[in-house]
């Protein structure tokens, strides 16, 4: 389902250096490079897939499954990654929730970067992931959409940014958000609830990492052009009008507050099937 057009996708944000470091941290904490059969769930245009490839201790006999719901993203990933001699990269068109059907064999590691918050039935997905792992397999994920991801010293920025953007939206476009149900990424779990989710599926948590990241202007500017972000903070507003208002409001507040970065917290979790009962 290639919706909301490629103009409003996550790609430009996903290649920013600070965001790459966030995902590198997860892969290194989970020691994904030691594994042979690896799923990159929600791979997008292949940014994390490339990071996995760079960390492989041995490429021989390695199989990577790059899974995404967007055929356009998978095509871009295949072009970006290219042919590999010693390993196989399989590009799989599927929703994350259909993992059982998308990947037939058991794998050593499943990586899910900054997307688990979108999944409506997270418990069902994590159970699928457990069933798909080999006996000592690893599940690693991160997210910046959880209760507590905004440090207290970022609250003033967000309040001013949203208020200014809403005023711009009303003044320049005569629009206001439609106050309806939240999109799934805005219905947020706490970090502890994510841990409970993993443990309830029968996995053992190995890494529970909260990482404060200083996000530069470019990060907030790019995320303001992402359809899910716009729909989350300005539900019902046309994407082009929402993006324009958010980015204009951001620029004004950034200058007025004389900011260099604004912090956000990423949760990174690695869990193992080790010693769990089949």
Residue ranges and their predicted role:
Residues 4-5, 206-260:
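C-terminal helical/coil "lid" or tail adjacent to the Rossmann-like core of SAM-dependent
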Residues 17-34, 51:
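Conserved alpha-helix/loop element of class I SAM-dependent methyltransferases that forms part
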Residues 39-41, 45-98:
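Class I SAM-dependent methyltransferase SAM/SAH-binding core
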Residues 101-110:
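A short acidic, Gly/Pro-enriched loop at the edge of an enzyme's catalytic core
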Residues 109-122, 145:
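A short SAM/SAH-binding and catalytic strip from SAM-dependent methyltransferases
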Residues 123-135:
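A short glycine-rich, Lys/Arg-flanked "PGG" loop and its adjoining helix->strand segment in the class I
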Residues 140-170:
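Conserved class I S-adenosyl-L-methionine
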Residues 186-201:
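Short alpha-helix
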């Amino acid at each position: 389902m290639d919706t909301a057009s490629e103009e409003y996708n996550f790609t430009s944000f996903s290649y920013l250096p600070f965001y790459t470091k966030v995902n590198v941290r997860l892969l290194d904490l989970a020691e994904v490079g030691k594994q042979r059969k690896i799923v990159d769930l929600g791979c997008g245009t292949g940014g994390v897939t490339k990071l996995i490839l760079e960390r492989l201790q041995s490429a021989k006999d390695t199989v990577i499954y790059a899974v995404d719901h967007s055929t356009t993203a998978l095509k871009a990933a295949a072009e970006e990654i290219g042919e590999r001699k010693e390993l196989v990269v399989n590009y799989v068109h599927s929703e994350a929730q259909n993992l059982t059907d998308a990947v037939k064999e058991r794998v050593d590691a499943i990586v899910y970067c900054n997307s688990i918050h979108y999944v409506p039935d997270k418990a069902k997905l994590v159970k699928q992931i457990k069933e798909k792992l080999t006996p000592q397999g690893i599940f690693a994920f991160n997210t910046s959409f959880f209760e507590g991801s905004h440090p207290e010293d970022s609250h003033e920025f967000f309040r001013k940014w949203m208020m200014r953007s809403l005023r711009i939206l009303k003044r320049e476009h005569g629009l206001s958000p439609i106050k309806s149900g939240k999109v799934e990424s805005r219905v947020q779990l706490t970090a502890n609830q994510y841990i409970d989710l993993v443990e309830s599926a029968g996995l053992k948590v190995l890494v529970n990492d909260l990482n404060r990241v200083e996000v530069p202007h470019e990060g907030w500017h790019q995320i303001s052009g992402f359809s899910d972000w716009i729909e989350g903070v300005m539900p019902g507003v046309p994407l082009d009008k929402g993006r324009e208002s958010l980015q204009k409001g951001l620029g004004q507040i950034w200058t007025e507050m004389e900011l260099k970065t604004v912090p956000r917290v990423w949760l990174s979790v690695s869990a193992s099937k080790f010693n769990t009962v089949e």
